[in-house]
């Protein structure tokens, strides 16, 4: 009987291990992340700040980067860069899935400003899921003054113009359009449909 219970326990542990998956959504400390279960691709955007400049009334330092990669089982390789930067400026790293909807990210070198906010090279940085969101991709705007539309036909534009580098959570893709939500630091949720041609390409 003991052997039977032990066997059941081991099987359950293995099932729990392999059933773990990355959850798309908003994580702690300024991380937004999306995971496409079909392709195994993970995309994300980290944006955090520290310090306070009394003269300008803004933060002194900022750490910002976009990343993408693929995940198999619980580990993945990512490439990170500032939205719009060229490929030679990218920094590789690793993403690893933890327990209880946590994950860690570690980069081979620091992005500008990150050392004063959060180091990603000394040790893996841990993030906890704050809110699950049904995103399959996170992408950014590559044009300037880009329109958002009311539907996937693109017949009626909203009174919104997105500047270059705006980061979006993508939930649905239909034809040449994607339904998206603008990721920013305000409580206002701006949603609409955007042309795929106005977004960074997914290799």
What are these regions (language model features)?
Residues 14-19:
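Sec/Tat signal peptide C-region and signal peptidase I cleavage site
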Residues 20-100, 106, 115-131:
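Central antiparallel beta-sheet cores of small beta-barrel/beta-sandwich binding domains
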Residues 183-189:
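Short, exposed beta-strand-loop hairpins at the edges of beta-sheets
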Residues 23, 40, 115-155, 160-163, ...:
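SH3-family beta-barrel domains
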Residues 3-13:
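Sec-dependent N-terminal signal peptides
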């Amino acid at each position: 009987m003991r052997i039977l219970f032990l066997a059941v326990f081991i099987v359950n542990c293995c099932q729990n291990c392999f059933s773990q998956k990355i959850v798309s959504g908003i994580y702690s400390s300024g991380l937004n992340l999306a995971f496409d279960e079909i392709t195994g691709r993970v995309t994300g955007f980290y944006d955090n700040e520290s310090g306070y400049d009394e003269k300008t009334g803004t933060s002194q330092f900022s750490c910002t980067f976009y990343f993408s990669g693929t995940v198999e089982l619980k580990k993945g390789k990512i490439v990170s860069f500032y939205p719009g930067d060229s490929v030679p400026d990218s920094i590789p790293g690793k993403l690893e899935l933890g327990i209880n909807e946590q994950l860690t990210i570690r980069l081979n070198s620091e992005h500008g400003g990150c050392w004063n906010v959060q180091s990603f090279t000394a040790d893996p940085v841990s993030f906890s899921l704050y809110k699950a969101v049904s995103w399959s991709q996170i992408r950014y705007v590559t044009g300037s003054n880009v329109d958002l539309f009311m539907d996937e036909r693109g017949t009626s534009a909203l009174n919104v113009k997105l500047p270059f580098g705006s980061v979006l959570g993508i939930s649905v893709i239909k034809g040449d359009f994607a339904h998206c939500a603008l990721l920013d630091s305000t409580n206002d949720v701006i949603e609409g449909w955007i042309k795929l041609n106005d977004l960074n390409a997914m290799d």
